[in-house]
Amino acid sequence: MVSNIDHKAMEALLRGQGCANNLKILLENGEISSVSTEPLIHTILDSFSLALSFMDSPNHPPYHESSSHNMASHMSRRSSKQVQHRRKLCVAEGLVNYNHDSRTMCPNDGFTWRKYGQKTIKASAHKRCYYRCTYAKDQNCNATKRVQKIKDNPPVYRTTYLGKHVCKAFAVHDDTYSSTMIRFDQVVPEPIMPQLTTIDHQVITVEENSAEHIMNQECDINDYLVDDDPFWASQFPPFPSSDTMFLENISAFD
């Protein structure tokens, strides 16, 4: 008979074993980076520490060889099934999943993402947001991630990455809050005069989903809002009568 504490310790060990298997896959594929390996290493160490704390608990029942043997055999059967299932998924779909905790909701991880949904979690006061790679359709990239706030003070966001990127497009700017297909790059002109206020000057880049080309359309509106005040009268006084006659004489030669 497996006690409640033994069951919790077993779950912690299985969680650590799962992260160890994911770490092994990353090492075999040569995808070694601090972003991908550090969360897995921390989870493995935390899982073993948690399991040891359960085993050292004063409420833990005394050691019996039969119960220990049953627990070990149960863990062996369950872990074997999980390893086989995960191995099939990884081989068939090339999945790589791991967690990453950060102080920001969407840290710059080198890829662009598009949010496609969110839902309320019963055990949490914060909603879970779901993202997919921006190039999921264009380049058949099946990488996704979900982000959820797990702590308030200080704020900590947990990002769970699922799938493996096959796209070759890396993010240039940290714009993962809203990975949209239309980007507006603001161009602020130098002010000509304090009384001139530019209406708009934008370069709009539209990325077509159905085409492989990018159409650049530049909208440059050189219209200005002019304040009606005595400033213009002082800056541009009216022509005197002599200058007017001079201009009329010049126009007579044309």
Swiss-Prot record:
Species: Arabidopsis thaliana (Mouse-ear cress)
SUPFAM superfamilies in the record: WRKY DNA-binding domain
GO MF annotation terms: DNA-binding transcription factor activity; sequence-specific DNA binding
Stated family: Belongs to the WRKY group III family.
UniProt keyword Transcription regulation present: yes
PANTHER family listed in its UniProt record: WRKY TRANSCRIPTION FACTOR 21-RELATED
A single GO cellular-component term on record: nucleus
Keywords: DNA-binding, Nucleus, Transcription, Transcription regulation
Protein name as it appears in the record: Probable WRKY transcription factor 67
Main location: nucleus
Location of the DNA-binding region in this protein: 102-170
A Pfam family that the UniProt record links to this protein: WRKY
InterPro entries, per the entry: WRKY_dom, WRKY_dom_sf, WRKY_plant
Keyword Signal (UniProt): no
